[in-house]
C-alpha cells in the first residue's frame, strides 16, 4: 500500500512541489512550482537514514565511464530560470550540466535521468532555490577585487573593459589596444569568474580597430569620453559586422556631434548594445531612452538608478563629477553633470524594465554603479513594480512567475545572447558550463549560500575553520577549492573573438583557462531578448522630460523603503 503524508510534511522533507509557492526574500514576489521531476516516494536525498546509499538511490555497480553517471548532483532544487520554475535534480559532469530531471538508481527506481554512483557527490538543495550564475556586461575593470565581490552576490561572468585604476578605465569600459588586451587576458588567469574584454571603438582607420579584435577583444566600446561621433560609431560597426562581435555604445550626452536621430542614422539597421539607455549614466540628452523602441537596439540600464528612490537624484550628481573627471570649478562641467540627471527619465526607467522594453540590467562597476548589487537591485525593481503596477498578465496570487522570468532574464540569458556567449553560460540547461548559484529563499537576491563555478564549489558561506561543525561562527563567505591551484583556471572561461580563437590566442599567451569564441551576434535583434523584447513607440517631452509609451505617460514614485536592504546587512 502507498504511504500518504500532508503537503507540509512533504515540503519539510523534500522541498516544495507542484503548486507550492516560495516567497523570494522579503519581497512581494512568489515563485510557484510549475513541474516536479521527482517520482513521489522515490526522491533521492542524502544523509543518515536517507535514500542515497549503496544499493538504494546510489547504484552499486556503475562506473564514471557511463555517460549518465554524474560527478555532482544538486538534489531536489527549485530551478528559477528565464523559461521555467521547476523542481528537479541537476546532473553535472566534467564541469558542465548534462541533465535536468530525476536522479537515482535506475536498477530500482523509475524514470531516472541522472545516475548517482559511487563517484557522485551531492549538494542537498531541498527547500533551496537554484539560478544560473549572473552576467554583468557593463564592468569597468578598475579593481581585481570586483570579481570576488560580484561572485559573492551570484555573478559569475564579467564583460567590459579596463586596465586598472587609470582615468580611461574609471570613465570608460575600454581595454585599449593589443598590448593592454593581452595583459588583461593574462590577468584573467587569476580571477575566479568568466571574463571578456571590449576594446576601444574610436578610430577612423579600421586597422586600429581590427588589431584589437585580432588581439582577443570580444567587441568594441564607443564612449563619449573618447568621442562618440556618428563617424566613429559607423566605423566600429563596420568592423563588428566583419568579425561578428558586439558594439557597446555610451552615446553623446552633450549632443556635440549630433542628436539621437543622427546616431541612429549612423547605426542604420545594425545591432548594438545600448548602455544605460535611461540616460542618467550618459547618452543623448534628453531622449536617448527613445532608442529602446528600435528593433536593432539591445538596451540595458545600470543599477545606480534602479530602483528609483528619494535618494537617487542627489547621489548621482556627485557620482558623475568623479567618474568623468569633471571639475566643480568649471560651469560647463557642472552643466554636463546636471544634464544627465533627469528625475523624469529615471522614474520611467523602472517601468520600462517592467514592461520588457529594457532588456538587461548591469552594474557600471565603480563608474557610477555597484558591482555587487546587480541581482539585488533587479529584484527590488520587480518588487516595486508589482507594488505600483500590479501583477503582470498571467500572474495571480502567490504566482509571479511571468514577472520573475522576465527579471531573471535581464542578468542571465539576455546578456549572454547579446555578447555571443549563450552557448556556454546564461541559463540552467544541458550542455552549459555549470555556473550555478544556490540560495536559501529567505536570502534570495541578497546573499547566496554557495556558488558552483564550472562544476566545483567556488565560494560558500562557511564557519570558522577550527569549528567542530561547518556552521561555527563567524559564518561568512569563504573561498572554496574552486579558487585554489589549477582549479582557478580549469573552472572558468575567457571569451575572445572568433578570429583570436582561431589564430590560437590561448597558445600565444600560454593561457590555461578555457578559451571560447563569441559567436552569432551580428544577426541578433531585440526579438531575441527573452521575455524582454517589447518595442513600443517611445517619446520624451523636450521641455518636461516626461516619457510616453504609445502616447501614455509613464512614471513611478520614488521609493522610501525597499526590500532586500538593511535587515540583511546587520552583520
Curated annotation (Swiss-Prot):
SUPFAM superfamilies tied to this protein: Composite domain of metallo-dependent hydrolases, Metallo-dependent hydrolases
Chain positions recorded as substrate binding sites: 223
UniProt cofactor note: Binds 2 nickel ions per subunit.
GO MF annotation list: nickel cation binding; urease activity
Gene Ontology CC: cytoplasm
One protein family per Pfam: Urease_alpha
PTM-bearing positions, type N6-carboxylysine: 221
Family of the protein in this entry: Belongs to the metallo-dependent hydrolases superfamily. Urease alpha subunit family.
Cross-referenced HAMAP family: Urease_alpha
Protein name in UniProt: Urease subunit alpha
Protein's organism: Staphylococcus aureus (strain bovine RF122 / ET3-1)
Lineage per the UniProt record: Bacteria, Bacillati, Bacillota, Bacilli, Bacillales
Amino acid at each position: 500500500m502507498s504511504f500518504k503524508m500532508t503537503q507540509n510534511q512533504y515540503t519539510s522533507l523534500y522541498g516544495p512541489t507542484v503548486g507550492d509557492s516560495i516567497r523570494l526574500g522579503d519581497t512581494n514576489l512568489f515563485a510557484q512550482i510549475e513541474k516536479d521531476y521527482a517520482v513521489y516516494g522515490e526522491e533521492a536525498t542524502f544523509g543518515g537514514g536517507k535514500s542515497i546509499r549503496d544499493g538504494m538511490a546510489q547504484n552499486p555497480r556503475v562506473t564514471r565511464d557511463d555517460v549518465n553517471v554524474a560527478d555532482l548532483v544538486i538534489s531536489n532544487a527549485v530551478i528559477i530560470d528565464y523559461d521555467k520554475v521547476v523542481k528537479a535534480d541537476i546532473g553535472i559532469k566534467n564541469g558542465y550540466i548534462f541533465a535536468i530531471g530525476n536522479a537515482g538508481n535506475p536498477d530500482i527506481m523509475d524514470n531516472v535521468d541522472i545516475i548517482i554512483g559511487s563517484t557522485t557527490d551531492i549538494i542537498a538543495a531541498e527547500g533551496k532555490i537554484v539560478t544560473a550564475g549572473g552576467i554583468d556586461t557593463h564592468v569597468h575593470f578598475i579593481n581585481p577585487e570586483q570579481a570576488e565581490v560580484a561572485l559573492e552576490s551570484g555573478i559569475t561572468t564579467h564583460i567590459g573593459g579596463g586596465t586598472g585604476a587609470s582615468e580611461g578605465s574609471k570613465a570608460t569600459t575600454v581595454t585599449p589596444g593589443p598590448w593592454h588586451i593581452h595583459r588583461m587576458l593574462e590577468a584573467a588567469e587569476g580571477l575566479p569568474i568568466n571574463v571578456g574584454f571590449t576594446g576601444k571603438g574610436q578610430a577612423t582607420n579600421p586597422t586600429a580597430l581590427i588589431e584589437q579584435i585580432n588581439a582577443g577583444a570580444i567587441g568594441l566600446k564607443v564612449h563619449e569620453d573618447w568621442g562618440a561621433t556618428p563617424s566613429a560609431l559607423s566605423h566600429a560597426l563596420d568592423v563588428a559586422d566583419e568579425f561578428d562581435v558586439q558594439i557597446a555604445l555610451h552615446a553623446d550626452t552633450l549632443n556635440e556631434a549630433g542628436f539621437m536621430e543622427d546616431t541612429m542614422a549612423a547605426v542604420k539597421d545594425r545591432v548594438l548594445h545600448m548602455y544605460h539607455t535611461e540616460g542618467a549614466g550618459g547618452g543623448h540628452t534628453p531622449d536617448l531612452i527613445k532608442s529602446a523602441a528600435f528593433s536593432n537596439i539591445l538596451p540595458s540600464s545600470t543599477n545606480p538608478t534602479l530602483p528609483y528612490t528619494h535618494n537617487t537624484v542627489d547621489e548621482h550628481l556627485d557620482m558623475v563629477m568623479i567618474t568623468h573627471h569633471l571639475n566643480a570649478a568649471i560651469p560647463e562641467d557642472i552643466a554636463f553633470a546636471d544634464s544627465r540627471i533627469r528625475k523624469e527619465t529615471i522614474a520611467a526607467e523602472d517601468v520600462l524594465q517592467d514592461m520588457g522594453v529594457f532588456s538587461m540590467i548591469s552594474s557600471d562597476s565603480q563608474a557610477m554603479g555597484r558591482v555587487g548589487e546587480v541581482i539585488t537591485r533587479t529584484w527590488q525593481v520587480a518588487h516595486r513594480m508589482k507594488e505600483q503596477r500590479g501583477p503582470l498578465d498571467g500572474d495571480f496570487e502567490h504566482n509571479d512567475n511571468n514577472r520573475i522570468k522576465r527579471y531573471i532574464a535581464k542578468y542571465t540569458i539576455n546578456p549572454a545572447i547579446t555578447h555571443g556567449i549563450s552557448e556556454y553560460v546564461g541559463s540552467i540547461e544541458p550542455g552549459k558550463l555549470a555556473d550555478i548559484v544556490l540560495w536559501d529563499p529567505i536570502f534570495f537576491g541578497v546573499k547566496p549560500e554557495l556558488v558552483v563555478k564550472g562544476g566545483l564549489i567556488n565560494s560558500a558561506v562557511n564557519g570558522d575553520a577550527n569549528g567542530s561543525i561547518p556552521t561555527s561562527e563567524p559564518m561568512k563567505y569563504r573561498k572554496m577549492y574552486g579558487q585554489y591551484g589549477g582549479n582557478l583556471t580549469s573552472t572558468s572561461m575567457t571569451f575572445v573573438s572568433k578570429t583570436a580563437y582561431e589564430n590560437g590566442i590561448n597558445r600565444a599567451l600560454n593561457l590555461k583557462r578555457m578559451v571560447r569564441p563569441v559567436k552569432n551576434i551580428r544577426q541578433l535583434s531585440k526579438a531575441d531578448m527573452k521575455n524582454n523584447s517589447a518595442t513600443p513607440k517611445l517619446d520624451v517631452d523636450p521641455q518636461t522630460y516626461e516619457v510616453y509609451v504609445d502616447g501614455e505617460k509613464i512614471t513611478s514614485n520614488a521609493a522610501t523603503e525597499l526590500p532586500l536592504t538593511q535587515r540583511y546587512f546587520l552583520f
